[in-house]
Amino acid sequence: MKKSFKYFRANPCGNITGFVVAPVYPGYRKAYTKCIIEQIDKDVEQVGFISPAYEGAPLRMDMMGGEFCANATRAYGLYSAGFYDTDGLVDIEVYVSGHEGTTDVIADVKNQKAYVAMDAPLAKKTVKVKGGDYKLIQLPGISHLIVEGQEDEKFVQDALEVLKKDYKDEAYGVIFFDKEKLEIVPFVYVEGSDTLFRESSCGSGTVATVNYLEDDIDGLDEDYKISIKNPAGELEVFVYEFEDGKKLCVGGEVELSEVEKKSIDIPQDVVASVIAEHDKIVEERKKQMAEEEQEKVVDESDLTDEELEIMRKKFGFD
C-alpha cells in the first residue's frame, strides 16, 4: 500500500527525528516509522506524527509509541512557531503525547533554537538493580534511572527488567552519568513500540540528570544554568518561572529541513495485520458497550410518557 504525505526532518542535538505532517491512524504509526527509516532516511532515530489544522499552526504531535519526547517536542514547537508572526523568543503551548494538557516551548525561529519546559518529577525513588541502589526520576511520560558509571548494555537489560516489572510507564531511560564531566549516555526503551535505542541526545534524560543533581528546583533562581554533554553535543538547561511555577527548560539549536512530499510503500502483510487488529479492537469495544448497556439501571426520568405507562402496567408500578 503506497502512502504519500508531507514530511520534514529535525536535528535537535543529533537526535534525528522525522515528522509526518498528516493524520495517521495510530495502528499504522509503527509501520510508517519502519518504512521511513528503511525507504527515506536511515539516520532517523524516531518519528513524530503531526496532526495539521485546516489553516495555521498544527493541532498536536504524537510519538510512535505514545510516549513523551523532549527533543521531538521542542523541534515540533519550533516548527509550530513558524506559523506565527514573531520576532525573537516566543513562548507557545503545544499538545504532545505522553503529557496531559499543554507543554510550553520557548522558541526562537530566527536563530533556530527551542527549549521545552519540563514538569517537576512525579517522584524520586531508589531502585535496586543487581545489588546496587540507583535513583529513579519519574517524569510525566517517562522514567529515567540515573547510573553513575560507565556505559554497560548488559546493565541496561537488567535495569529494564526491573523497571518494566515494578514501575509501569510509557517509556524508560537508563542514563549513564559521569558526574565529574557532566556527561551522559542515554538509553531509551519505548513500551508501545518495543524499541530500545542508544540515543544521540535525550532532553528528558538531561532534565532527569539535573533533578538528580538538584534536590529542590523551586529553590533555584533564574540565573541557574547548566550544560550536560550528550553523545552528539551539549544540551542547555535553565530555570524559568511560568504562571504555574518554576520549571527546568532544556534545549538548544534545532535544524529543520524543508517540508517535502514523500511516499512509502507499506507491505501488504503489515496492512492486513493492522486491519485485523483494528477489527479486533472494534469488536471488543462493541462487546464492552453492550455489556455496559445491559448493566444500566432504568431511570424513569429517561422514559417517555408512553414507555413509562407500559412499564407501570407490566410491573405494577403506581
Model segments located where?
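A glycine-rich beta-to-alpha transition motif near the start of alpha/beta enzyme domains, typified by
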Residues: 1-112, 138, 143-278
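A structural signal for alpha-helix termini and helix-coil/disorder junctions
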Residues: 38-42, 165, 284, 291, ...
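Membrane helix-loop-helix hairpins that form the core translocation module of multi-pass transporters
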Residues: 111-120
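Active-site glycine-rich loop that binds ribose-phosphate moieties when present
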Residues: 119-135, 154-162
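Residue-level marker of intrinsically disordered, low-complexity segments enriched
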Residues: 125-127, 269, 279-280, 295-296, ...
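Acidic, proline-/serine-/threonine-rich low-complexity intrinsically disordered repeat tracts
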Residues: 272, 276-302
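Long, low-complexity, intrinsically disordered segments
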Residues: 301-318
